[in-house]
């Protein structure tokens, strides 16, 4: 896979190696898990001595496409959750894998060691038995350490170096034509809805699922009726719907600011609330001083 990737010619696709890993995990989860396990197993022998760096390399080999350290000083971590990259406190989810996932891997290794010890004992091979006995004690010590807070702290410090991407935060949310829903990503340039990809570099998503609607669906008719009550003038109603559609494109390419004016009870607050519920974190309320105050 790595060799083929290296000799491939560049086309219009912007897929990264991380995305190919993600595609593989979606296409065949069990085979992908087996592949990643074999990748990380390369570092298991070195890790038996208890090196924090070797443990970190095991985690990198198995989870390098899912976690990023964006700042070593501030310990800022992100995890790809299927649609977006979500920030997590101190890399806590990766840290949990040390006590759970890696501990289980070394438990399985110790079971194999016990089998080899038994075989060498039955064969009355003292040299082999001593070798496996030493190995067993090393793994037993490591298993205890994997559940120790000070040991995990040191491993996470090494993970910061292994998973570090100094430009990661600069890449986030830079494509104005991608918008994340709860169940996928809509590409406004290609006019397609698809699964999220790591190289989308999205960190925010709307509060709603994407679904296809027909004009005669009950929900569509209800929204149209609501808008027609607020905007009886059909041309004004169409103008607002076109305007509202622009909110899905990042930035302000028209360089316009809109003010909703009018007396009370004319639907402004309800309309605003609907937009906020739909957009989630993408809807921001800022202080009026941003407009009325002096330039910074």
What are these regions (language model features)?
Residues 1-3, 18-22, 54-58, 154-160, ...:
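Short, hydrophobic/amphipathic alpha-helical patches that form generic packing surfaces
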Residues 2-42:
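Basic, alpha-helical nucleic-acid-binding regions used in initiation and control of genome expression
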Residues 6-7, 161, 296:
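Short, conserved secondary-structure transition motifs
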Residues 11, 29-33, 65, 108-115, ...:
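Intrinsically disordered or highly flexible coil/loop and linker segments, enriched in small
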Residues 41-208, 212-214:
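Intein modules and their embedded homing endonuclease domains
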């Amino acid at each position: 896979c790595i060799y083929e990737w290296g000799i491939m010619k560049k086309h219009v696709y912007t897929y990264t190696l991380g995305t190919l890993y993600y595609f593989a995990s979606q296409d065949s989860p069990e085979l992908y898990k087996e592949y990643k396990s074999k990748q990380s197993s390369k570092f298991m022998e070195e890790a038996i001595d208890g090196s924090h760096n070797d443990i970190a390399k095991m985690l990198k080999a198995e989870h390098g496409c899912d976690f990023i350290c964006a700042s070593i000083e501030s310990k800022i971590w992100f995890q790809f959750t299927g649609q977006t990259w979500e920030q997590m406190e101190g890399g806590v989810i990766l840290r949990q894998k040390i006590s759970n996932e890696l501990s289980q891997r070394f438990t399985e290794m110790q079971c194999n060691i016990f089998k080899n010890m038994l075989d060498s004992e039955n064969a009355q091979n003292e040299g082999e038995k001593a070798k496996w006995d030493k190995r067993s004690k090393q793994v037993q010590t490591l298993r205890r350490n994997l559940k120790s807070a000070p040991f995990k702290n040191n491993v996470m410090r090494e993970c910061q170096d292994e998973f570090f991407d100094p430009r990661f935060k600069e890449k986030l949310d830079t494509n104005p034509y991608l918008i994340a829903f709860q169940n996928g990503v809509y590409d406004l340039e290609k006019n397609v809805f698809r699964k999220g990809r790591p190289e989308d570099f999205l960190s925010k998503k709307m509060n709603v699922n994407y679904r296809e609607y027909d004009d005669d669906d009950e929900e569509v008719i209800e929204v149209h009726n609501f808008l027609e009550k607020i905007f009886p003038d059909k041309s004004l109603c169409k103008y607002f719907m076109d305007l509202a559609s622009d909110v899905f494109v990042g930035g302000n390419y028209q360089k316009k600011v809109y003010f909703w004016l009018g007396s009370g009870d004319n639907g402004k607050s309800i309309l605003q609330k609907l937009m906020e519920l739909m957009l989630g974190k993408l809807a921001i309320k800022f202080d009026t001083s941003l407009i009325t105050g002096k330039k910074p």
